[in-house]
Swiss-Prot record:
Substrate binds at D102, G152, Y307. Belongs to the histone deacetylase family. HD type 1 subfamily. One of its GO terms (biological process) is neuron cellular homeostasis. The keyword Transcription regulation applies. InterPro entries: HDAC_PDAC, His_deacetylse, His_deacetylse_1, His_deacetylse_dom, His_deacetylse_dom_sf, Ureohydrolase_dom_sf. It comes from the Eukaryota. This is Histone deacetylase 8. GO terms for cellular component: chromosome; cytoplasm; nucleus. The gene is hdac8. Binds 1 divalent metal cation per subunit. It comes from Danio rerio. It catalyses: N(6)-acetyl-L-lysyl-[histone] + H2O = L-lysyl-[histone] + acetate; N(6)-acetyl-L-lysyl-[protein] + H2O = L-lysyl-[protein] + acetate; N(6)-(2E)-butenoyl-L-lysyl-[protein] + H2O = (2E)-2-butenoate + L-lysyl-[protein]. Histone deacetylase that catalyzes the deacetylation of lysine residues on the N-terminal part of the core histones (H2A, H2B, H3 and H4). Histone deacetylation gives a tag for epigenetic repression and plays an important role in transcriptional regulation, cell cycle progression and developmental events. Histone deacetylases act via the formation of large multiprotein complexes. Also involved in the deacetylation of non-histone proteins.
Length: 378
């Protein structure tokens, strides 16, 4: 699986990269019922490909209530802490905080939220301290959580915490979200400010969660024009996605001129994901990532969605190789989860034959609208 941008190889090989990891952190993240053992699968494949030796592995700290309260309300955090200890699914207040249905209450869920929040804060702090050019937390990227409620399997919005940490040093921070779902929690958090621009490329369709993120959603008040949304229909493939991404990001860079970047790389866009929506491969996402890395700004990389666990591990391992300028063998190395990659035991993900519902003329209109909106950025 060797398709990489040659022009970026020299830069990527000299890039300083921090990888946030500890056995305890991975074990905690493995407990999330939506993606059981996914954190272990991702880390094990990265390790099996020998990529750890090219990065500085940093143990994450666990976020305190005070650190999470920089964004989340005390009442939400205190309630999450209380029910986490009890494992109480019947607390009548839980529904007010978005807990239940898609964010089930399980024992230890507060510890999970604190672990993820702390890991992203650890990554951001390493960027602030100049200890790396890129920091990675693949178990982070939970972009739906609101300040006072859980949402969409997200109990803490670690992406928002990471952005706020970077804002301690960098005046303008750009958030880029290529998850299948609209990054609504992050957009909402910064919808009234011109200091953080949010760019989300996602599926936008009636009845599809979270139901927000049309091209006309552009922010509010002082933050108007600082939210950029790129809606896609089902079936989009690498080429069309990357062309759209590049057209939008070129304009964003020129007009917003960010000083740091947070990029959420949810892998539920992959062909073969149970969401059965987009038709992408790691090669396409890597092209988007390479474009951002070419700006040579402090960059925080986060995970997100991805419900075909093997494909998610394939994707994030390939992206880790991209960051490091390492070409990875197509053959999955022998390791603890080797049997999960059958029947072909290959790193590649092939697109399916499903149709692309995105018409070129429609996407051109979307891009034109976005470029017109961005002209209002001052």
């Amino acid at each position: 699986m060797s398709e990489k941008s040659d022009s970026n190889d020299d830069k990527s090989r000299t890039r300083s990269v921090v990888y946030v990891y500890s056995p305890e952190y991975i074990q905690t993240c493995d407990s999330l019922s939506k993606v059981p053992n996914r954190a272990s699968m991702v880390h094990s494949l990265i390790e099996a490909y020998g990529l750890l030796k090219y990065m500085r592995v940093v143990k994450p700290h666990v976020a305190s209530i005070e650190e999470m309260a920089v964004f989340h309300t005390d009442s939400y955090l205190q309630h999450l802490h209380k029910i986490s200890q009890d494992g109480d699914n019947d607390d009548p207040q839980s529904a007010d905080f978005g807990l239940g249905y898609d964010c089930p209450v399980v024992e230890g869920i507060f510890d999970y939220a604190a672990a993820v929040g702390g890991a992203t804060l650890t990554a951001a702090q390493n960027l602030l301290d100049g200890k790396c050019d890129v920091a990675i937390n693949w178990a982070g990227g939970w972009h739906h959580a609101k300040k006072d409620e859980a949402s969409g399997s997200c109990y803490v919005n670690d992406a928002v915490l990471g952005i706020l940490k970077l804002r301690e040093k960098y005046d303008r921070v750009l958030y880029v979200d290529v998850d299948l779902h609209h990054g609504d929690g992050v957009e909402d958090a910064f919808s009234f400010t011109s200091k953080v621009m949010t760019v989300s490329l996602h599926k936008f369709s009636p009845g599809f969660f979270p139901g927000t993120g049309d091209v006309t959603d552009t922010g509010l008040g002082k933050g108007r024009w600082y939210a950029v949304n790129v809606p896609f229909e089902d079936g989009v493939r690498d080429d069309r996605y990357c062309q759209t991404f590049t057209s939008v990001m070129q304009e964003v860079k020129a007009l917003f001129n960010p000083e740091a970047v947070v990029m959420q790389l949810g892998a539920d866009t992959m062909a073969g994901d149970p969401m059965c929506s987009f038709n992408m491969t790691p090669v396409g996402v890597a092209k988007c990532l390479t474009y951002i890395l070419g700006w040579e700004l402090p960059t925080l990389l986060l995970g997100g969605g991805g419900y075909n666990l093997a494909n998610t591990a394939r994707c994030w391992t390939y992206l880790t190789g991209t960051v490091l300028g390492q070409t990875l063998s197509s053959e999955i190395p022998d390791h603890e989860f080797f049997t999960e990659y059958g029947p072909d035991y290959s790193l590649e993900i092939s697109p399916s034959c499903r149709p692309d519902r995105n018409e070129s003329q429609h996407l051109e209109r979307v891009i034109s609208t976005i470029k017109g909106n961005l002209k209002n950025v001052v």
